[in-house]
């Protein structure tokens, strides 16, 4: 399977939609947009092809479902009936777009040197990121959106599964409600887990649909955490960061874990980017 074959497969699977397609050969992306208002999404074909080797048709089904829901929610409609309980925070990488395709700034806040908090209107099976043009229709200020979203994310259930590896405990929050990574904003929940930890607490949001918390008690734990975050990061539909965060008393600090077999392979580009982001974040605070 190559990008051209994947392009054709997706176009065939999405032929029931009233959309147009625009293929960018150089960037290996496919933009899918509505014919009535030109709103749409852009997907990276090379990333899907890479996942296809492992997940086969399942990844295609996931993309088709995602596009179906996104295109449906991009229809022009009123936002006046939206309730406060539908305002939610979503976590994105700091490299995520700051504006819509039409050039309208999104409502977002810095979170860490690696992550940013965007805000969204929950629409059931999908959500729509809030931009400045929507504030008037929502009849909300940016501050009200922040407060509502944090209140709502704290109301989400925080069920998790655990796994123990060589004395280290790993917690996985994976409810697939679109806000698993957003639970990193629930300080009360993180503090609850921190109280149970016997070693160093690490937190990771490799992609939108998972939050990993680890109680690291030995060197093996760090290696496992590094492997987990990279594994989830490469397989997520909305990847965020492959780095973990140290957590202590409400404070998150991005860290770069060196695997035991890679001590001489410390990527200077990764370190340089992390340090640059960290300096910029601290300067702007």
Curated annotation (Swiss-Prot):
Annotated protein name in UniProt:
UPF0354 protein MW1686
- Any Pfam family from its record, for instance, is DUF1444
**Native source species:** Staphylococcus aureus (strain MW2)
Provide the organism lineage as a comma list: Bacteria, Bacillati, Bacillota, Bacilli, Bacillales
Domain of life (superkingdom) = Bacteria
Tell me which family the UniProt entry assigns to this protein.
Answer: Belongs to the UPF0354 family.
Against InterPro entries, the record matches this protein to:
DUF1444 (IPR010838)
């Amino acid at each position: 399977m190559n990008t051209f074959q994947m392009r054709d497969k997706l176009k065939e699977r999405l032929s029931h939609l009233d959309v147009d397609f625009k293929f960018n050969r150089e960037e290996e992306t496919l933009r899918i947009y509505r014919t009535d208002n030109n709103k749409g999404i852009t997907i990276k074909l090379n990333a899907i092809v890479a996942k296809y080797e492992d997940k086969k048709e399942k990844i295609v089904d996931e993309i088709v479902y995602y596009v179906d829901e996104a295109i449906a929610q991009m229809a022009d409609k009123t936002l006046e009936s939206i309730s406060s309980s539908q305002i939610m925070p979503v976590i994105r990488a700091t490299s995520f777009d700051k504006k819509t395709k039409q050039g309208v700034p999104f409502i977002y806040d810095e979170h860490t040197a690696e992550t940013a908090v965007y805000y969204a209107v929950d629409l059931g099976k999908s959500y729509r990121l809030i931009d400045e043009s929507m504030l008037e229709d929502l009849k909300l200020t940016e501050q009200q959106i922040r407060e509502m979203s944090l209140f709502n994310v704290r109301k989400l259930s925080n069920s998790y599964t655990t796994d123990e590896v060589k004395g280290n405990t790993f917690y996985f929050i994976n409810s697939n409600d679109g806000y698993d990574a957003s639970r990193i904003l629930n300080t009360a929940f993180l503090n609850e887990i921190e109280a149970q930890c016997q070693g160093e607490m690490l937190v990771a949001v490799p992609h939108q649909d998972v939050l990993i918390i680890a109680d690291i008690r030995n060197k093996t734990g760090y290696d496992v955490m590094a492997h987990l975050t990279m594994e989830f990061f490469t397989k997520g539909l909305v990847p965020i960061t492959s780095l973990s965060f140290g957590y202590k008393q409400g404070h998150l600090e991005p860290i770069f874990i060196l695997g035991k077999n890679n001590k001489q392979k410390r990527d200077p580009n990764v370190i340089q980017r992390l340090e640059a982001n960290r300096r910029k974040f601290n300067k702007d605070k």
